[in-house]
Amino acid sequence: MASSAQIHGLGTASFSSLKKPSSISGNSKTLFFGQRLNSNHSPFTRAAFPKLSSKTFKKGFTLRVVSEKVVGIDLGTTNSAVAAMEGGKPTIITNAEGQRTTPSVVAYTKNGDRLVGQIAKRQAVVNPENTFFSVKRFIGRKMSEVDEESKQVSYRVIRDDNGNVKLDCPAIGKSFAAEEISAQVLRKLVDDASKFLNDKVTKAVVTVPAYFNDSQRTATKDAGRIAGLEVLRIINEPTAASLAYGFERKNNETILVFDLGGGTFDVSVLEVGDGVFEVLSTSGDTHLGGDDFDKRVVDWLAGDFKRDEGIDLLKDKQALQRLTETAEKAKMELSSLSQTNISLPFITATADGPKHIETTLTRAKFEELCSDLLDRLRTPVENSLRDAKLSIKDIDEVILVGGSTRIPAVQELVKKLIGKDPNVTVNPDEVVALGAAVQAGVLAGDVSDIVLLDVSPLSLGLETLGGVMTKIIPRNTTLPTSKSEVFSTAADGQTSVEINVLQGEREFVRDNKSLGSFRLDGIPPAPRGVPQIEVKFDIDANGILSVAAIDKGTGKKQDITITGASTLPGDEVERMVSEAERFSKEDKEKREAIDTKNQADSVVYQTEKQLKELGEKVPAPVKEKVEAKLGELKEAITGGSTQTIKDALAALNQEVMQLGQSLYNQPGAAGQAGPTPPGSESGPSESSGKEGPEGDVIDADFTDSK
């Protein structure tokens, strides 16, 4: 019977992705799984790569995608943005509505139509249960991890059979994975980018919070696949911001990126200069963002109303949505005003009649409501500086990223912590997408002389004796990296072992994130301690983990499938990809149907107008034919298919052409009203025209026929 408590660790090998794993020496000491090797037997390096000059890196490590546009996407909790390299500079791409950012909102109407972006956000109050926002807070997570977040939204967050998060959509009787909703936002961004660039976009660099764990990164990549995108690279948001800030800057600087978005908080310390962007450390909190500040205002408003009226507005989905939107608006206004008026008429009704909310929120009261959230911003900043082995005096610039950094109390806190005014030369809503575009340009070969060295945000390890986490790859290890551990059996004839892979910084398994467990079967029966199974952990440049195992005795490589992770299984992703393609096809067909119908309506109107204007000038047989085809087109518009409308439209156009021809074939057609080619208007005849006083002024009627 295999158990994680019955595995021998025979030694540890640590190596970069450039080197082969060192062989295990014959005299390596055997110890029980769960014991730490001393420093002589555990040669972990702090980073996969030592500090190298940019010249060293410029020779390799670059994935090239030739002659194809690669975009950078900031997939945000509240808003998303897309950018591309244009004319050698990163440029924000405006969406179909002409906006530089797109709300990360997806909605389904009662008739099954899907809305994405601003149009979805506008109807949230009247359709709260089918409007999905802040979905990024649920991506790649188990239901047990999002208890607090699930109470902040107006839609139902449910648990599936594996304990993963699903979002219920009663309008179409379906539940979605968070990846599917995010994929629909990505799809809109890419479609809008394709139109803007006049080139089909299929490849992208997508950003994630620096403190996202492996499951969340994998889920984000899956969202890209479902959207029909090839995600070439997942990069951290603070790192992307530094790329945008440091692009084309030559001087060396140590910068701290303070990234407070709608749902997450990250802090990264980087060395930037001469094209090299090296992340020294990163820290953060994936349960802290602008949504939490909004929630404090919502709770305050709902609490006061319950005290005065005895009604809990948080149980009313529509009222909750109105409160949430009002709280966000009030928060934004308090960034420039000392107080704001909150007015919510007809928020609910009782037997006594309709009830309203009319109150004033001051900036001081807002800061009081959010005081503990502001305190939570301190620790990641301090941790990041400590891990980078730097003091506040070593920081040259502080870059603010994310819309929530506009809150005056946040800016004041940063100033107190670092001792200098933040740099305000970058747009906090756009800088991440711009940085992603720079990285996209590097991968596409449009940008050279840039080297990016990122780090793993969280430690990676295994469950060992007593429910303890033994760290294999420590946090802030430069990526990509690869480390291995050699295991053996703890019992004679043992043929399998089971290992739980963990990510986090706490000492005990229960306090860390389980990425899943794998069972290694097929070990040849042998006395205990004889088999040597090397388990290798690889973290790629995206920060995504893969695990492999090799039986060192036979050289046989075992395929390991991690189970129980909070990401979607492969077959589920494939199903969602095909479903998204089907939806995309249906959307195109719906759009074509609408465009065809609109065109047909316009032709009907123009034809009827033309018949009315021409009146008796149209020969009766021709008029009858046109009217017959007009009737057929009207019938097709009322209940016909798109193809039927197209056929009827073509037939009507043919008859209208005949109508025009018949007008010109009539005697005296030159004087008839009708479509006249530009420049062919004739002057007055000798008998009827009159010259003006100067002999060059003509009395005539001018008809502009279009």
Curated annotation (Swiss-Prot):
Protein known as: Stromal 70 kDa heat shock-related protein, chloroplastic
Region listing for Disordered, in residue ranges: 663-706
Listed GO CC annotations: chloroplast stroma
Family of the protein in this entry: Belongs to the heat shock protein 70 family.
Ranges of Low complexity composition bias in the record: 666-687
Subcellular location: Plastid, Chloroplast stroma
Cystines in this chain: none
InterPro entries with a match to the protein in the record: ATPase_NBD, Chaperone_DnaK, Heat_shock_70_CS, HSP70_C_sf, HSP70_peptide-bd_sf, Hsp_70_fam
Residues of the transit peptide: 1-67
Protein's organism: Pisum sativum (Garden pea)
Function: Interacts with newly imported chloroplast proteins to assist in their maturation.
Residue ranges, compositional bias (Acidic residues): 694-706
